[in-house]
Regions:
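Short, low-hydrophobicity acidic/polar segments
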Residues: 1-144
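Contiguous ligand/interfacial binding patches
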Residues: 96-97, 147-159
Length: 159
């Protein structure tokens, strides 16, 4: 399953879900009791173990999974500092933040829709992927580090 593909001048950058990727699923009952659980990707699908329950509940999905000790609402902190490490096309997916619109069901089994189907999330990327191609005839050694800055405006938050 493709997460994203960028094609610039026939140079393709593709990220894909890989076995072991961890998505967070937060679910909350109508009484405000909330849980944060991990769903792990394997063989083309994410799976998670949710407790047996029926009734009204709300689901929120996000990536990458973050352990949260006290998930009582639909918020989770995802560390996101200003420095990023990228090694060629070896994408660092810990900065590929995605989330899905909340889903709510009135009287469904845990992990199911009201009509008994498995819940399914449409993930939306919260960051941008940028492609840089550096060329210079004066450089006779490999470029190992580059710093991007924008005059007068920050390009990333401190955390």
């Amino acid at each position: 399953t493709t997460k994203s593909t960028i094609d610039v001048n026939d140079l393709t950058f593709t990220t894909r879900w890989t076995d072991g990727d961890k998505m967070g699923i937060m679910y909350e009952y109508d009484n405000g009791e909330g849980y944060n659980t991990q769903a792990t990707y394997s063989n083309g699908t994410f799976s998670s173990k949710l407790p047996e329950a029926t009734g009204t509940r709300f689901y929120y999905a996000y990536y990458p999974y973050q352990a949260a000790d006290n998930a009582t609402s639909h918020y989770v902190d995802i560390p996101f500092g200003a420095e990023r490490v990228q090694n060629g096309n070896d994408f660092n997916s810990s900065y590929d933040i995605m989330c899905a619109e909340a889903l709510d069901f009135e009287n469904a089994e845990q992990g199911k829709t009201d009509d008994g189907k498995d819940i399914s999330f449409i993930m939306v990327r919260q960051t941008a992927l940028l492609y840089f191609h550096f060329t210079s005839p004066e450089v006779d050694e490999p470029l190992t580090k580059a710093t991007l800055s924008v005059e007068g405006d920050p390009i990333a938050a401190d955390t």
